[in-house]
Amino acid sequence: MDSYKTISREKVGEGYYTEKRSKFLAFSHHVDTVDDVKELVAQYRKKYFDARHVCWAYMLGHERTDFRANDDGEPSSTAGKPILGQINSRELTNVLVVVIRYFGGVKLGTSGLIVAYKEAAALALDDAVEEECLIEEQITYTFTYVMMNDVMRLSLIHI
């Protein structure tokens, strides 16, 4: 049977990383829809209203085709992309990682930002509980009674 990896709904993974007085708070969540993502990001923006940046990335679907990364004002590809990279490196899906940055007064540069967001995301994912889920599909067949033996034989072969 096919399966996919995700993180548990029961526990929010948390991580804390500092670099040159900047503080990075990271959180990983299980999500099922883009609406879940929007709601959680809005909650973090409200809770950490005084933070300089609230950057995030998500991956959705067992085929891992629905994803997005957001830098929230950081230089292009220095925040969201490294966060998404951590999700990808673990082959996870149905996951949102949010990283909140409090600026410490010292600029980190492009490579410093990439490392900081990557490390913070990794810490949050390390703290989460990974799960493997089976892909389930319900299939309904309609057939005549005469075909019963053939259908049963086929269904046993493909289960």
Go through the PLM ranges and name each one.
Residues 1-78:
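C-terminal regulatory domains involved in ligand/effector binding and gene-expression control
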